[in-house]
């Protein structure tokens, strides 16, 4: 019996955070035995916001090395760089022709990013969700791991796929309609200084973010200064409505140690101050990240191995993507290349 197909991507823009790890990359490693996984470093998506060429080049290699360091196995999964598979851009253009302007203008992420990058609101940023739809539909993905900020994009991908199928192949659909995959993760990884906001790798205030490759001393320092509250006496309790800062730290501690929230509350019952708890959270995060960092540095220095991973991944992805694109071109009426 064939495994369900999963597609997920990571952007090579900015340093990846522990939020990227706990919310996505750790699940990538865990899903490999039960799913047919297609994992992509989405450099085409990255340039919807202006990038320094040298920085993008290095960030793409960094992201690939991190994927390998967290346990993505190229023998189990297809790991590739998006721009190495031209079918993504080809199908993306075609799907533009089956997407309505009104649909794209309603995308909340476009509204947010266009406000942030007001001096560079380009067509690529507007059409970002269409390329994402192409990423998904090329591989017949049954499930797509998505966070709250990407749910709307997945819904659009479903709408585009359904529209195309109804026009050209209602009896024998070309595109699989993808479903969201909701990861089972305890941690809602929020900003360290304002736990009402999601931790973002692009946050201008670096005190809010812990990156995957962060120095251990810096991790400890940031956790020590993280938001808590002024409740007297101090109380370690998982309560997002009233204790967001503590709940955020509990989520990180749970993710790093495997302890439940109930176990954490019991362990720190009757604390006189938050300092010892923060110390334990920082040390747990360091212990979680140190082996990943060591493996990352080993892989990053082996460019020959990374080249081979990219080459094999692109070959595997292209073979599957080309099959889908051929079917699409045929039903649309394109003349095949002799």
Curated annotation (Swiss-Prot):
Catalyses which reaction(s): tRNA(Trp) + L-tryptophan + ATP = L-tryptophyl-tRNA(Trp) + AMP + diphosphate + H(+)
Keywords: Aminoacyl-tRNA synthetase, ATP-binding, Cytoplasm, Ligase, Nucleotide-binding, Protein biosynthesis
Motif, 'KMSKS' region: chain positions: 198-202
EC number(s) given by UniProt: 6.1.1.2
Residues annotated to bind L-tryptophan: 135
Localization of this protein: Cytoplasm
Motif 'HIGH' region, residue numbers: 12-20
Signal peptide: none
Binding site residues for ATP: 11-13, 19-20, 147-149, 189, 198-202
A GO term for molecular function: ATP binding
Catalytic class of the enzyme: ligase
Cited Gene3D superfamilies: HUPs, Tyrosyl-Transfer RNA Synthetase
Annotated Gene Ontology cellular component terms: cytosol
InterPro entries: aa-tRNA-synth_Ic (IPR002305), Rossmann-like_a/b/a_fold (IPR014729), Trp-tRNA-ligase (IPR002306), Trp-tRNA-ligase_bac-type (IPR024109), Trp-tRNA_synthetase (IPR050203)
GO-annotated biological processes: tryptophanyl-tRNA aminoacylation
Function comment: Catalyzes the attachment of tryptophan to tRNA(Trp).
Assembly and binders: Homodimer.
Sequence similarity: Belongs to the class-I aminoacyl-tRNA synthetase family.
Protein known as: Tryptophan--tRNA ligase
Annotated source species: Vibrio vulnificus (strain CMCP6)
